[in-house]
């Protein structure tokens, strides 16, 4: 299986290009990063491909994405359309999208929301671009997408292991979404550490370190669904506010970080293949 990892502008005090080269040198075959409505985004895509790395996916913007369930074509809708157009024109194959954001509101599936997301899929189909809808808080809306839209060829899902652990306890998302699983965000965390579910627990730790995700269960589940696509890690290198999950990475250069990440990816692959 091919292996990929994310790069982010705020992960290190180095450029995205330097991080991408470190990813390549660590042994990964692919990389993924956020879309931006800039010429630099297109330049980074071209640079990545010139190194020989594949663009495993791109991450769509998700600010105010909960408005998709309450308004007809809200501002975020138009931003997502622009993102789809850019990715399609650059021959990106997979775009990861959130369907909800917010910890102080109740997720509710609505007709207008299904219509908005259906229109996004319409646009993606023009480019044969796969939309991989990701589990976050408000997982009820993800199940709404599955119920109403998963019959569409370009509608599928991205399962984030860390989100499942700290946001979606009690769900078996790989089992529920395996029929249309397009991508993975593999990462670890400490679970819910406070008195409520909150984004600061979404640590994105390298697997097999000090997080609490059950990796034996995860790799067993991957094996059971015959997963043979990307082993893709979505990681952070810095602490969330008032957290200390990444203290061990303070001062670690990006080359060493991506070497550690690649070893974790190989271990996951090995466990799946056992």
Where are these predicted regions, by residue range?
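Histidine-acidic metal/acid-base catalytic patches
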Residues: 1-4, 9, 13-24, 92, ...
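A cross-domain feature marking catalytic cores of carbohydrate-active enzymes
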Residues: 7-9, 33-37, 57-62, 97-99, ...
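Active-site acidic/histidine proton-transfer and metal-coordination neighborhood
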Residues: 49, 69-157, 166
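Alpha-helical scaffolding within the catalytic cores
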Residues: 39-43, 79, 169-172, 217
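Acidic-and-aromatic substrate-binding clefts and catalytic sites of carbohydrate-active enzymes
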Residues: 10-15, 30-43, 64-74, 102-106, ...
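Aromatic/hydrophobic pocket-lining residues that form π-stacking "cages" and hydrophobic walls in ligand
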Residues: 19, 44, 83, 120, ...
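Alpha-helix-loop-beta-strand connector modules within alpha/beta enzyme cores
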Residues: 47-63, 114-127, 213-220
């Amino acid at each position: 299986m091919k292996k990929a990892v994310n790069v982010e502008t705020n992960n290190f005090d180095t450029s995205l290009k330097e991080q991408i080269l470190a990813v390549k040198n660590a042994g990964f075959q692919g990389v993924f990063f956020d879309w931006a409505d800039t010429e630099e985004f297109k330049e980074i895509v071209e640079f990545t491909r010139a190194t020989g790395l594949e663009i495993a996916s791109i991450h769509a913007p998700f600010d105010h994405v909960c408005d998709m369930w309450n308004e007809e074509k809200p501002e975020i809708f138009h931003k997502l359309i622009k993102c789809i157009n850019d990715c399609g024109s650059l021959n990106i194959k997979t775009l990861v999208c959130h369907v909800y954001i917010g910890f102080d509101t109740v997720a509710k599936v609505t007709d207008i929301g299904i219509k908005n997301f259906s229109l996004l899929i319409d646009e993606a189909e023009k480019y044969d671009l796969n939309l991989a809808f990701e589990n976050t808080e408000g997982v009820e809306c993800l199940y709404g997408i599955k119920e109403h839209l998963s019959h569409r060829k370009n509608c599928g899902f991205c399962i984030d292991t860390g989100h499942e652990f700290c946001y979606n306890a009690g769900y078996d998302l790989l089992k529920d979404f395996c029929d249309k699983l397009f991508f993975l965000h593999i990462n670890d965390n400490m679970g819910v550490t406070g008195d409520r579910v909150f984004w600061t627990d979404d640590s994105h730790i390298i697997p097999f370190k000090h997080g609490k995700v059950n990796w034996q269960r995860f790799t067993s589940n991957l094996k059971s669904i015959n997963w043979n696509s990307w082993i893709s890690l979505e990681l952070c290198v810095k602490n969330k506010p008032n957290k200390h999950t990444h203290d061990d990475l303070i001062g670690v250069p990006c080359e060493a970080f991506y070497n550690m990440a690649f070893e974790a990816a190989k271990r996951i692959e090995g466990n799946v293949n056992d």
